[in-house]
Design a protein with these regions (language model features):
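Structured, active/binding-site neighborhoods that engage oxygen-rich ligands
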Residues: 1-265
Length: 265
């Protein structure tokens, strides 16, 4: 959970092409480093999945919709996409066939709660389908959750790469140095998730993973949130970064994060 939130916070000052900084030598935190919709939805999904452990798919989806709408309305103006922002305020919200990277940025809880890979994939699908029911939207969430689950259960980077390429058809052959020059702000899963996974695969530790993701440019907060979620599962998160993460949340969001830590453990 910390990985996605830290990626969001650290990447937030560099979002959009005019803010992109295509190098790794940037201040990890600055005055403009703040949480966005990525964090809000990550925590909403976490609460929904915790509240419905052991329940059926319909109950899980209902809880997802409730928590996402409730928390999203409590934190307006945090960078939600136009379609998603409309969904937040619908009385009877329905999925809208999105393949945006929002499904992947918020999926951490599915991989962290899952007892096996099959469950991680299933929970990821449920978290995506309430809004992002396009096959690419579901695939992005599942690929991220699978990489996370494999990382936290001892798989090597080579095994993670092989699994993601084989099962999801993502091309992970290009290096970050090859991606970086022409990469720009895009919000689709198919143009964000492979790049985020590549940033993790090339990293040397947790912080380097986030710096590498941000250095690619593009939708930097979401890209780093996806990379960070996988990097946390593989490396863990240094305590000083956890403390800084909590410091940059509101008391309500910090309480949700701490509740997740306590119950998920």
């Amino acid at each position: 959970m910390y990985g996605a939130i830290l990626g969001d916070i650290i990447g937030s000052p560099y979002e959009f092409d005019f803010n992109n900084y295509k190098s790794k030598d940037f201040p990890l935190f600055c005055q403009r480093s703040e949480f966005t919709d990525d964090t809000v939805m990550t925590l909403a999904v976490a609460k929904a999945l915790l509240d419905t452990c052991g329940q059926d798919d319909a109950a899980i989806k209902a809880a997802l919709v409730h928590q996402m709408q409730q928390l999203g309305r409590a934190y307006p103006g945090r960078g939600y996409g136009a379609h998603f922002n409309g969904w937040l305020y619908e009385a009877a919200p329905r999925p809208y066939n999105s393949y945006g990277n929002g499904s992947a940025m918020r999926v951490s809880a599915a991989a962290e709660l899952a007892k096996n890979l099959e469950q991680a994939l299933h929970l990821a699908k449920l978290t995506a389908e309430v809004t992002h029911n396009h096959p690419e939207g579901i695939k992005g969430a599942q690929a991220t959750a699978a990489a996370m689950f494999l990382a936290r259960t001892g798989s090597s980077k080579a095994d993670i790469r092989t699994y993601v390429e084989r099962e999801f058809g993502y091309d992970l052959s290009r290096s970050c140095d090859e991606i970086r020059p022409d990469y720009h702000h895009v919000e689709s899963c198919q143009e964000t998730v492979p790049q985020a996974i590549t940033a993790f695969l090339e990293s040397s530790d947790f912080e380097d993973a986030l710096r590498t993701a941000v250095s690619l440019g593009g939708d930097s907060d979401t890209l780093a949130a996806i990379t960070g979620s996988i990097a946390e599962a593989f490396y863990g998160v240094p305590e000083n970064l956890k403390a800084e993460c909590r410091r940059r949340l509101t008391p309500e969001l910090e309480a949700l994060l701490l509740a997740w830590e306590a119950r998920a453990a």
